[in-house]
């Protein structure tokens, strides 16, 4: 940690601990690049979904009379970018590709913490399809959720099989649309996420390819971002929002909470067995680390380079300058969790020994 980051973290932690007066917003507006399910609306995905479902952010700011407003976007990352452009959001939970696109066109944001790393991609087809591999997609009608963090990994998988989007008949569909199109056979194949395993289990789809267990460049990342203006005006409130994500990530990583974690995640409509299968092979503590480590920076740099190479953006993005470690450092210090998560290097390997989990009651509240 640099001297400036250490100083910021120390001052912010003292602010939180001593309850000193700090500039405060009347409302905190958080945008999520995902729709809710059900009525009343349910959102439980990832650590921040747990925080939302348990009302931890509302509890954090209630004593100060600060209102927390949540906005969920069926249009995913591109819709979040539009809301950020119109200054309708202060924070955003967003995938790597759309946030990088936003940065490239001048959206002034900062990456504060990771929300989920190394998320898998699946290629699915109808169960009786003649398609046996990625190479068989040439000339086929394929669903891809364009503009989201599924697009670039899909393009990379295609490129490794000497294909590009131009070789396919690409249909821009959201994930629910891909599910429906596979069932009704309105597409020949679709690049999608873990939810398609539910269709597989019902005999409605077959998995042709998955990025599980492959190189990190094929995976997708999600992060918490803040609007520059908000972070500059309200550094204390920004740290407290990050602190809520840190608490949620710590809660998810605790084996004592595993059963409830999967139960809550399954409320999004994906069976617990499917979620467990998708996340198998690596502890939740690693998959939901909030750290802005070398791996996170490398993945976003790779996305920025990939977008530029594919001419999906016109201007390069200075990725390291986009990551603001200070708020996460302060939140980890305030929660007594500095060293709890294991940093990962750019290649995806652990680079240090993580601190043991704090005993019950050790983490500061």
Residue ranges of each PLM-predicted region?
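Short, polar/charged alpha-helical segment
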Residues: 27, 37-68, 85, 103-105, ...
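Segments of small-molecule ligand-sensing domains
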Residues: 28, 275-365
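Short loop->beta-strand "edge-of-pocket" segments that line small-molecule binding or catalytic clefts
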Residues: 29-45, 135-147, 247-251
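Secondary-structure end/capping motifs
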Residues: 37-38, 234-316
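A ligand-binding cleft/hinge motif common to bilobed small-molecule-binding domains
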Residues: 93-105, 155, 187-207, 299, ...
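Pocket-lining segment of extracytoplasmic ligand-binding domains
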Residues: 129, 171, 176-269
């Amino acid at each position: 940690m640099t001297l400036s980051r250490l100083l910021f973290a120390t001052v912010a932690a003292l602010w939180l601990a001593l309850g000193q007066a700090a500039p405060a917003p009347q409302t905190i507006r958080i945008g999520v690049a995902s729709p809710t399910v059900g009525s009343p609306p349910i959102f439980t995905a990832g650590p921040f979904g747990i925080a939302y479902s348990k009302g931890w952010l509302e509890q954090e700011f209630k004593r100060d009379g600060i209102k927390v407003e949540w906005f969920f976007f069926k249009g995913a990352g591109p819709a979040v970018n539009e809301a950020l452009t119109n200054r309708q959001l202060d924070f955003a939970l967003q995938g790597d590709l759309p946030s990088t696109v936003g940065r490239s066109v001048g959206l002034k944001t900062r990456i504060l913490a990771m929300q989920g790393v190394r998320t898998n991609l699946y290629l699915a087809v109808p169960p009786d399809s003649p398609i046996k591999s990625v190479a068989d997609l040439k000339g086929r009608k394929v669903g891809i959720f364009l503009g989201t963090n599924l697009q670039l990994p899909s393009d990379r998988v295609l490129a490794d099989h000497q294909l590009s989007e131009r070789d396919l008949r690409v249909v821009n569909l959201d994930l629910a649309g891909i599910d429906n199109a596979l069932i009704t056979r309105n597409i020949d194949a679709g690049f999608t996420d873990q939810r398609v395993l539910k269709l597989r289990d019902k005999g409605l789809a077959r998995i042709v390819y998955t990025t599980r267990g492959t190189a990190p460049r094929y995976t997708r990342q999600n992060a918490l971002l803040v609007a520059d203006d908000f972070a500059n005006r309200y550094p204390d409130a920004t740290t407290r929002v990050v602190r809520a994500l840190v608490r949620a990530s710590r809660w998810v990583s605790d084996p004592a909470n595993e059963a409830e974690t999967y139960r809550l995640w399954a409320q999004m409509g994906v069976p617990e067995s499917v979620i467990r299968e998708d996340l198998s092979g690596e502890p939740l503590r690693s998959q939901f680390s909030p750290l802005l480590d070398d791996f996170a920076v490398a993945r976003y740099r790779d996305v920025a380079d990939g977008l530029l190479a594919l001419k999906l953006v016109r201007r390069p993005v200075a990725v390291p300058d986009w990551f603001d470690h200070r708020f996460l450092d302060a939140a980890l210090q305030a929660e007594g969790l500095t060293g709890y998560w294991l940093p990962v290097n750019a290649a995806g390997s652990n680079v240090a020994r993580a601190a043991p989990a704090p005993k019950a009651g050790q983490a500061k509240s």
